[in-house]
Structures are given as structure tokens and as C-alpha cells.
A protein has these predicted regions:
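Residue-level detector of functionally pivotal "anchor" positions at catalytic/ligand-binding pockets or at interdomain
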Residues: 192-202
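C-terminal PAP-associated
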Residues: 1-192
Length: 202
């Protein structure tokens, strides 16, 4: 993979933002935490980090297996970067059926920072987020100054009641400003159906 923003961590563009207001990609570390699953037949860890792909930021996600005995190995991995939108500040998780989702921020010179997610069913071809991408919430403003930080970090968790609902939270702005960020919480399933996410107000 190619490191994103090796000279300066702040390189993610936003709509209607000054050049000095590019956002921090934080491409030098894993995002969120490794999510662990024990399926009986195997154990998995999933996580991600931000990389440079196609001239923009993309999500490098992966699943490790044999994580508690023997030599851990990469079971699947891929860089998710389907177009020229910058995607970063992601969080990965896996439900009880082995379906995987990645929530993340998305931005470009033409859009305000947005909250999106993509996923794969356990039966999908390896190394793909074959269920595609959906918008959880579209911001309507950009962040100015505040040391270029963004998210720190986003969070994706599985509902302990049904073990299939993904709950995701991330940052957005409803108006361009230097400090008044908002937080959005939403939930969704990776089912293959064209399901709209459920949202909670911040």
C-alpha cells in the first residue's frame, strides 16, 4: 500500500474550504480497534487503516484468522476506493453471521464531509465489499481550522441484543464553522437488501 499524506497528515479536501482547512487523514495508524469474533470453527480479527489509492484516500480493510494459536494469517484484504471521493476515518465490524461492514467519512472538493458505509456478506467473493456503499448522513458544512482534526475516531459496534445490527457513529457539520461539529448515530444491517439506515439525532 502507499501511505497517505506522508509529508503532512492534513490532506483531505472539503467543499468550500480553504487550502489550510484540509482534514487530517491519520494514515499512520490503525483506525478504531481490532474487532474480534469467535465462530467456533475459526476466530477472526477485522480492522482497517487509511491509504493512498488512485490519488485519493481509500480504506484498506482486512480480516485476520488463526489469531490466538499458531501463526496469524491474512484471510482477506482489499482497498476500498471506487471513485475519486476521499474515504477515511473508518471503523470495521463483523456480525454473528460473518457479515462485515466498514463505516467511514467521505469528502472531496465537491462535497461536504459525509458519513457512509459499505459491506459484504459472508458468502460474497473474498476481498470485496460486494454489497456496495450507502449514505448514512450527508453533512452540509465544512470544518475550518481546529488543527485539521476530524473524527478521532469513528466507531462501529454490533448490537448485543440481535448480534446482527451494526451501530455507527461519526462526525459531520451542518454549517461551515471552526468548531461546531455534530455527531450522528445510525444503524443498519448487511443483508443484501436495499435497506435504508435508521438514524438518531445528535
Amino acid at each position: 500500500f502507499t501511505q497517505i499524506c506522508p509529508a503532512t497528515r492534513a490532506c483531505v479536501p472539503q467543499k468550500d474550504a480553504r487550502a489550510s482547512s484540509k482534514l487530517d487523514a491519520i494514515g499512520d495508524r490503525l483506525m478504531f480497534r481490532l474487532a474480534y469474533r469467535n465462530f467456533g470453527s475459526h476466530e477472526s480479527l477485522v480492522s482497517n487503516y487509511t491509504v493512498k489509492a488512485g490519488g485519493v484516500a481509500g480504506i484498506r480493510w482486512f480480516e485476520l484468522r488463526h489469531v490466538t494459536s499458531g501463526v496469524a494469517r491474512v484471510f482477506q484484504e482489499s482497498t476500498y476506493q471506487p471513485d475519486l471521493i476521499w474515504r477515511w476515518m473508518a471503523s470495521a465490524g463483523m456480525d454473528k453471521d460473518g457479515n462485515l461492514a466498514v463505516g467511514f467519512s467521505a469528502s472531496s472538493p465537491n462535497i461536504f464531509p459525509q458519513i457512509r458505509y459499505a459491506g459484504r456478506k459472508a458468502t460474497d467473493p473474498l476481498n470485496t465489499l460486494a454489497q456496495g456503499e450507502r449514505h448514512l448522513f450527508n453533512g452540509t458544512g465544512s470544518q475550518r481550522r481546529t488543527n485539521n482534526r476530524w473524527g478521532d475516531y469513528s466507531g462501529l459496534s454490533i448490537d448485543p441484543v440481535d448480534d446482527t445490527t451494526f451501530w455507527y457513529t461519526n462526525e459531520y457539520y451542518d454549517a461551515t464553522s471552526s468548531f461546531n461539529w455534530r455527531t450522528r448515530i445510525g444503524n443498519f444491517h448487511v443483508t443484501g437488501a436495499a435497506e435504508l439506515p435508521s438514524l438518531s439525532n445528535d
